[in-house]
């Protein structure tokens, strides 16, 4: 009888698999941020990033990858809720709405250029 469990392809070690997961996390955050600016104010995106980093990394002592993962979860929930409530944005940039008199926007989180 053969073993039904998946096997790691030859030549792949745990290190490579973990590295691939970190690369996936980076790519996913960048893609989510690029889409989020079309639906959420840039200030909100920046604040979620900054507060996530401050709480999970600085206060709780979690790793950078864990902090990025928690940020990803929060942003996915925010985007889901936005669409669930009936998105009417259709690609308009939400970046400066309501910020005209508050000076330049803060620097964006990684991947949001």
From Swiss-Prot:
GO cellular component, one term: host cell nucleus
Cell compartments where the protein resides: Virion; Host nucleus
GO biological process: symbiont-mediated suppression of host innate immune response; viral life cycle
Short sequence motif named Nuclear localization signal, residue ranges: 65-72
Regions of compositional bias (Pro residues) in chain numbering: 103-113
Primary location: virion
Record has Transit peptide as a keyword: no
Region (Disordered): 94-113
Keywords annotated in UniProt: AIDS, Host nucleus, Host-virus interaction, Inhibition of host innate immune response by virus, Viral immunoevasion, Virion
Keyword DNA damage: no
InterPro entries xref list: Lentiviral_Vpx_assoc_factor (IPR053711), RetroV_VpR/X (IPR000012)
Location of region: Binds to human NUP153: 61-80
Subunit structure: Interacts with the P6 region of unprocessed GAG. Interacts with host VPRBP/DCAF1, leading to change substrate specificity of the CUL4A-DDB1 E3 ligase complex. Interacts with host NUP153.
Function: Plays a role in nuclear translocation of the viral pre-integration complex (PIC), thus is required for the virus to infect non-dividing cells. Targets specific host proteins for degradation by the 26S proteasome. Acts by associating with the cellular CUL4A-DDB1 E3 ligase complex through direct interaction with host VPRPB/DCAF-1. This change in the E3 ligase substrate specificity results in the degradation of host SAMHD1. In turn, SAMHD1 depletion allows viral replication in host myeloid cells by preventing SAMHD1-mediated hydrolysis of intracellular dNTPs necessary for reverse transcription.
Comment field (misc): This isolate is from a German AIDS patient (with predominantly neurological complications) who was probably infected in Mali.
Name by which UniProt lists this protein: Protein Vpx
Name of encoding gene: vpx
């Amino acid at each position: 009888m053969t073993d039904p469990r998946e096997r790691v392809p030859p030549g792949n070690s745990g290190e490579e698999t973990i590295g691939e997961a970190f690369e996936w996390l980076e790519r996913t955050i960048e893609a989510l941020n690029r889409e989020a600016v079309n639906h959420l104010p840039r200030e909100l995106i920046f604040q979620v990033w900054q507060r996530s980093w401050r709480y999970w990394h600085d206060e709780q002592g979690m790793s950078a990858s864990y902090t990025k993962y928690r940020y990803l979860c929060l942003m996915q929930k925010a985007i889901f809720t936005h669409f669930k409530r009936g998105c009417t944005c259709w690609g308009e940039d939400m970046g400066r709405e309501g910020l005209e008199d508050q000076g330049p926007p803060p620097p964006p989180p990684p991947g949001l250029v």
